[in-house]
């Protein structure tokens, strides 16, 4: 019997036809990234190896993640969780100002996130202690979506809500363009061709956002302009996929 890929199963289980207008916007957005000067973009993940990535705190990648159909999948959690570990994927390099182009997919009820400014140090047992997060979520089936729009896909987690919900259903690929620019004090998220979230990166406005969030008492949260990028393992028995990851440093 031919092996059926997990991505195909997810697509068949959760997929549905997208409206042509929305699909066109996503395709156009990815096409625009591809057409820009090759020298401006660095491929962070080419779909064939773990080059440029490792698991936070040095845990073994393949205990929880696998490579399939050009994507990295967090899909071995039931075995990996025996020791209560989390397997957050982190870049080898650090970045300051950048645009990140990344596709992501979740199964039903899944929760993840994309963090930046992460300091990898043994005194921080989790990347979210230092790194702010753009939420990756199944808005329909995960209970955190009911805790307010600052907890939904595309939000600057617990601080800024997306202006609208343009996320695709579980089992379909979404595309983020995440801009982080400390020099111009601008951060933003474009989801599937629509700019949905904008936020400051520093100054009084940033401090006010943090002060009104669950991170108010976290001394190191959002303090580091330069740091690593993390794809979160939220600690649940879920399937998360990421692919076509590129970065343009500003």
Language-model features: locations:
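Sec-dependent N-terminal signal peptides
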Residues: 4-12
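Carbohydrate-interacting regions of secretory-pathway proteins
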Residues: 17-250
